[in-house]
Amino acid sequence: MKLLLAGGGTGGHLFPAVALAQRLLEQDSEAQVQFVGTARGIEARVLPEQGWPLELIDIRGFVNQGLLGKLRMIPCLIRSVWQGLCILRKFQPDVVLGVGGYASAPMLVAARLKRIPTVIHEQNAWPGLTNRLLGPWARCVCLSFSEAERAFHRAATIVTGNPLRKGMEGCPPMDGDAPELLVFGGSRGARAINDAMLEALPRLEPWKDRLRIVHQTGGDDLQRIREGYARAGWPQESVVPFIDDMAAAYARAHLVVCRAGATTLAELAACGRAAILIPYPHAAADHQTVNARAMAKKGAGLVLAQQNLTPETLASLITDLLENRPRLISMSAAAKSLGITGAADRILRVCRNVCGQD
């Protein structure tokens, strides 16, 4: 099978696509994979480093722009679809899988024009506008959350789960060692979380000799946050711009402070880790809040709205959970119960089915 994976922008869209590509090549060494993204997305750095073929198209978001901005985007959208048609002509895929992100829409439209079967993978509990509009065009929409089915009443859907990076599904249970706190704001970091965590450090002083903090800051805030840790007397060696081996980071963690992107929640569930979830408030259709509430409803996490994010509140929640081991274990078990394994296999089965190779 020749599979074209379109999308990216953030790790939440990209990493499931990479997991799919890896699984496809494990199943069939003769299969071919082509990624399509943008120069501004995380894929422009990560995919070449990992040796994956990547084509770039010129497209940017327009959902949050005003009327004039949307009108100016029309020529850009037309150009990106044309670029997509050229990529399809060169690669000639059996199926195009849109994984979300700016590059996904033009490639799905181009594939529709070329009558190439399309599949969409929607990671969130409430889909973005692009996937809601393009869903009826796709042969199938694969969902990570069953709650998303209500948004695709005119499309064929299947709940597949979210493909995970290597090592996630084999994550060991939480151990009894000295507690470790994992803090991150997605693949690019999150300034609000970085700042709140930095200011919460003095309030975590009683834990200084017992608690290890691993903090992914993103590149922009790295030096500032490291200096803040040093001033507060906390080790700064584990303050890093990006964590390459997230499976190992989850395995060591007892509690996680993070955003509520769909891929993050799928990884928390697969690894069985309790979390303080701080949804990104400007996500399309506020989908991270919907994601977080779905997790919290099952007892697997606590939701802390960014508007309520203060150093005092964050430190209090961290302390309460670390001091209440039975509750931490219960939340971790609840998270583990939500994990859906084998998502990559299910999505690839759908792709083979729509292009007549199953």
Curated annotation (Swiss-Prot):
One of its GO terms (molecular function) is UDP-N-acetyl-D-glucosamine:N-acetylmuramoyl-L-alanyl-D-glutamyl-meso-2,6-diaminopimelyl-D-alanyl-D-alanine-diphosphoundecaprenol 4-beta-N-acetylglucosaminlytransferase activity. It is a peripheral membrane protein. Its EC number is 2.4.1.227. It comes from the Bacteria. It catalyses: di-trans,octa-cis-undecaprenyl diphospho-N-acetyl-alpha-D-muramoyl-L-alanyl-D-glutamyl-meso-2,6-diaminopimeloyl-D-alanyl-D-alanine + UDP-N-acetyl-alpha-D-glucosamine = di-trans,octa-cis-undecaprenyl diphospho-[N-acetyl-alpha-D-glucosaminyl-(1->4)]-N-acetyl-alpha-D-muramoyl-L-alanyl-D-glutamyl-meso-2,6-diaminopimeloyl-D-alanyl-D-alanine + UDP + H(+). It is found in: Cell inner membrane. Pathway: Cell wall biogenesis; peptidoglycan biosynthesis. Pfam families: Glyco_tran_28_C, Glyco_transf_28. InterPro entries: GlcNAc_MurG, Glyco_trans_28_C, GlycoTrans_28_N. UDP-N-acetyl-alpha-D-glucosamine binds at T10, G11, G12, N124, R165, S187, I243, Q288. One of its GO terms (cellular component) is plasma membrane. Its main location: membrane. GO terms for biological process: carbohydrate metabolic process; cell division; cell wall organization; lipid glycosylation; peptidoglycan biosynthetic process; regulation of cell shape. Keywords: Cell cycle, Cell division, Cell inner membrane, Cell membrane, Cell shape, Cell wall biogenesis/degradation, Glycosyltransferase, Membrane, Peptidoglycan synthesis, Transferase. HAMAP family: MurG. Cell wall formation. Catalyzes the transfer of a GlcNAc subunit on undecaprenyl-pyrophosphoryl-MurNAc-pentapeptide (lipid intermediate I) to form undecaprenyl-pyrophosphoryl-MurNAc-(pentapeptide)GlcNAc (lipid intermediate II). Belongs to the glycosyltransferase 28 family. MurG subfamily. This is UDP-N-acetylglucosamine--N-acetylmuramyl-(pentapeptide) pyrophosphoryl-undecaprenol N-acetylglucosamine transferase.
